Amino acid sequence: MTKREIEITTEDGVANAGLFGQAGGAGVILYMDAFGARAALDCMAERLAGQGYVVLVPDLFYRHAPYGPFDARTAFSAPATAMKIRGLLTATTQAMTMADSGAFLDALEREGVKGPVGTVGYCMGGARALNAAAAFPDRIRAAASFHGGNLASDAADSPYNNATRIKARVYVGSAGVDKSFPPEQSGRLAQALRAAEVDHIIENYAGMAHGWCVPDHGVYDEAGAERHWKRLTGFFAETLT
């Protein structure tokens, strides 16, 4: 499937994004992980677009471009590279991404997406996918996170704090061992979503490590990734049609 490069004007500049799929389908915003927009995420977007969706993969680090490229298998084992990535994460706040998300939604509309929109995020993108649903409750119908970190941390911008604003259905796939989303956060998120009457599922992928879904990651697990695809495509089929 052909990738089309587009530019999206935001409050802070211009974000590059990849667009996949044909006009007429429901829209999906894929929020990247900490290693940035790259071929591995393009492959994932292509697979999702093959289900009939129009998939947008924006570069969330556009304010600091050019950067990288980063090798997801080794980036955090090299101190200098790890420092660069952490700097990008710190400098790209949830509030920035939420402001950008309005522009991302508008871009999908310009590309012919008139119906419901879903979000899915990996790693740092998981929290952003859920927070986008809170920021745009009347535009986002489904939000999914896989190995998303800090979904119910003590940070003010942690998604569980925004549960009462979410109207979308929510799916969270957590890695079995993940310091960024330990069991106590899972319980806190579940409590917040249930109290807010959010239709949700939180599923633990036992034996999987943070990053298992993304094919260029060092902990990629094919069986676990295929299970993630089954859940994600089923979730969107139920919510975006």
Where is each model-derived feature located?
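N-terminal cap/leader regions of alpha/beta-hydrolase-fold enzymes
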Residues: 1-241
